[in-house]
Amino acid sequence: GLLTSFNGDAMYDLLAFHSKPAYAWQYVSGTLMHGSKGAPIWFLWVHLLLNGLMILPFGGLLERKRGSRQVLIVFVTATVLSSIVFHFLTQEQDIQATGISAVGYAFVTGGVLILPKMWKEFSLTVKWFYLFLIFLSGLMLLPVITGWISTLLHLSGIVSYLLVFIGSKGLKGGS
């Protein structure tokens, strides 16, 4: 990833998600990294850009409507759930991964659920921007584009938001 560009593979090995994690922090630290060993630098930047296009607009929308606390809960839930899913999908292998895509999909899911209530507030340009991002996010769910493991990790982000949303509704008595 970007860290390995400057610090070599040792940093990547220490912080990435692992199919066989050696340290507890690897369930979380891989979310804060991007790319993979040997990936071309352009791929790292494209991956980071696409994640940013999900996280910034939809995360901001979520924070405005649900508050910072719920955004943090969604972030942590998506991070941990995607790490666990990665672990179970790859436990027979010895591989590593990095990325924040599950958090992005959790935020997009929340945004898609919130947008209809806010649609009138947006200009036509902003509406088209959100529709484009939702379409792009949908494309990245296709296994033919991202592969099955990535698709399932992206889906874990969707499930994460739904778990937090359903849990918060249950705690408030369904209000």
Which role does the model predict for each range below?
Residues 69-76, 98-103, 123-130:
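Cytoplasmic-side transmembrane-helix entry/capping segments in multi-pass membrane proteins
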